[in-house]
């Protein structure tokens, strides 16, 4: 966490605006019992603060840290809800985008049934991972059986494969529904277009459809900062997923936009 590009960029831009912003590692946190509801970081009590920027998605300690703040970015309730990829497809609706056909199941699901609903080529996604982890292309029964190593308690989101978007997608960075940066990610060797997996990035000019999508996602989720991943369809974009804590390195390098600065300007405007 402490070495992450995004965290350090936010600290840098906060400092430029006279704001003291500190990186707190969740694994350094201890939460007291109900009779002593203090929160400790490396043994020291954390004091109340004006705001928290959530950059960690797991567990309950981060929820308790949010109790210290007057405001949270992103707000904790939609942050926790929309971490989950199934929740995203279940609730987000807009005429501006299409959604892949999808099913929720474990890795022991019946391949003939899944393929009859989604096509013989499909994508299996873990519900809460990012950066391309737990994303698999399923083309035959053996590919599906490989998911069984994760156990029956592991649920997967199965989606139809959008062939027109093989190895490429568009990442939109939205601040309260306004598009502040947009890039195309492209991989020459993988169906996944994640920067963390080596995909290249170039600036992408947002059109009215993309702006409508960003506005719809904000209005439906209340997420202040959102990375919206779109797949290329024949006529319209498909919603791939949204990211509740999107990284800044790729989008800032591809577009030259000071996204971290725009984020801090928005936060300053709330106080």
Per-range role (PLM):
Residues 133-220:
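Phosphate-binding site of ATP-dependent enzymes
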Residues 91, 105, 136-139, 174-175, ...:
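Short beta-strand-to-turn element immediately C-terminal to the catalytic PLP-Schiff-base lysine
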Residues 99-122:
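Rossmann-like NAD(P)H-binding beta-loop-alpha module
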Residues 172-174, 236-250:
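A short beta-strand motif that forms the metal-chelation/ATP-contact edge
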Residues 190-239, 259-271:
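A long amphipathic alpha-helix within ATP-dependent nucleotide-binding catalytic cores
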Residues 122, 180-181, 226, 238-240:
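Protein kinase-like catalytic core scaffold
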Residues 1-104:
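Conserved N-proximal alpha/beta basic substrate-recognition cap immediately N-terminal to
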């Amino acid at each position: 966490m402490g070495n992450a590009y995004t965290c350090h960029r936010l600290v840098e831009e906060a400092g430029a605006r006279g704001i003291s912003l500190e990186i707190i590692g969740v694994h350094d946190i201890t939460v007291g019992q109900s009779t002593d509801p203090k929160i400790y970081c490396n043994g020291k009590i954390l004091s109340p603060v004006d705001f928290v920027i959530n950059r960690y998605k797991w567990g309950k300690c981060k929820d308790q840290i949010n109790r210290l703040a007057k405001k949270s970015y992103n707000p904790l309730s939609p942050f926790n809800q929309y971490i989950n990829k199934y929740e995203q497809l279940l609730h987000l609706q807009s005429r501006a985008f299409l959604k892949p056909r999808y099913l929720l199941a474990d890795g022991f699901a019946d391949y003939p049934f899944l393929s009859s609903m989604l096509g013989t080529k499909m994508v299996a996604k873990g519900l809460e991972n990012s950066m391309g982890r737990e994303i698999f292309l399923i083309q035959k029964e053996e590919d599906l059986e490989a998911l069984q190593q994760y156990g029956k308690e592991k649920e997967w989101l199965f989606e139809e494969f959008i062939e027109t978007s093989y190895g490429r997608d568009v990442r939109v960075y939205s601040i309260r529904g306004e598009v502040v940066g947009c890039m195309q990610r492209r991989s020459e060797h993988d169906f996944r277009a994640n920067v963390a997996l080596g995909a290249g990035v170039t600036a992408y000019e947002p059109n009215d459809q993309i702006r409508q999508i960003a506005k719809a996602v904000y209005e439906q989720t209340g997420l202040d900062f959102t990375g919206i991943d779109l797949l290329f369809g024949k006529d319209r974009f498909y919603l791939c997923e949204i990211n509740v804590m999107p990284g800044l390195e790729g989008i800032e390098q591809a577009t030259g936009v000071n996204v971290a600065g725009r984020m801090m300007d928005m936060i300053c405007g709330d106080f």
